[in-house]
């Protein structure tokens, strides 16, 4: 399993001011790191940099001490991102969205079928496996995106506000599943504005006013 490090990074979207300055954080195997802050504080920006979607304006993002390249490079290293907007293909079924992703990252069709079923079941989605994404509710879509991320079994799992549309029972279940990923050995980074969800994590990094402050180092 791998260690993710952000080293003194300034992060800015193209042509814009830095959203975050001088961020340093490490997420190691077996732990869940909560990244908290209000809307617009930079949670998605930080996870985008960790996922290889946003090159730092300065500083570095490292996987096991080696510089992280673009998103393709991150995927090849086992960095899985569950995006805030779910990123699902509306014209595919829930099961197809997951199976396609597993096969695209090297899984066999048989393995994809097995992992898909194993990921959908604990999220209460077995009955929706063959429904199109556009037919699912917002909460069901969010859970499908989570299932896809879990099915990929990454070394690093980045979860961006993945409980925002879920009720209390499903939020608790998702946190249990993230904990299971950490127990498997993954480094899990969970961006959330939910204090209860953050409290269930091992450490908490809070973003505010362009800076990152440790609440629980």
PLM features per residue range, with description:
Residues 36-38:
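The feature captures the beta-strand-to-loop junction immediately N-terminal to the Walker
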Residues 51:
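Helix-to-loop junction immediately C-terminal to a conserved catalytic motif
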Residues 67-80, 109, 183:
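ABC ATPase NBD coupling module
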Residues 110-128:
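Conserved ABC ATPase "signature" region
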Residues 125, 149-150:
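ABC ATPase C-loop
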Residues 131, 152, 184:
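Conserved signature/switch motifs of ABC ATPase nucleotide-binding domains
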Residues 132-136, 140:
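Conserved ABC ATPase signature
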Residues 157-160:
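Catalytic Walker B motif of ABC-type/P-loop ATPase nucleotide-binding domains
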């Amino acid at each position: 399993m791998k260690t993710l490090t952000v080293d003194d990074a300034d992060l800015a979207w193209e042509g814009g001011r830095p959203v975050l300055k001088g961020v340093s954080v490490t997420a190691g195997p077996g732990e869940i790191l909560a990244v908290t802050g209000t809307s617009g504080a930079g949670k998605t920006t930080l996870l985008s940099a960790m996922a290889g979607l946003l090159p730092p304006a300065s500083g570095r993002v490292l996987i096991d001490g080696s510089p992280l390249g673009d998103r393709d490079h991150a995927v090849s290293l086992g960095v899985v991102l569950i995006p805030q907007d779910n990123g699902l293909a509306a014209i595919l079924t829930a099961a197809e969205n997951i199976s396609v992703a597993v096969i695209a990252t090297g899984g066999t069709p048989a393995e994809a079928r097995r992992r898909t079923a194993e990921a959908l079941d604990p999220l209460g989605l077995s009955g929706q496996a063959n429904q199109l994404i556009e037919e699912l509710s917002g909460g069901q879509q969010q859970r499908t995106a989570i299932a896809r991320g879990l099915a990929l079994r990454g070394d690093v799992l980045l979860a961006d506000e993945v409980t925002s549309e879920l009720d209390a029972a499903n939020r608790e279940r998702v946190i249990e599943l993230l904990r299971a990923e950490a127990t498997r050995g993954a480094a899990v980074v969970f961006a959330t504005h939910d204090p209860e969800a953050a409290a269930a994590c091992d450490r908490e990094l809070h973003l505010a006013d362009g800076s990152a402050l440790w609440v629980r180092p």
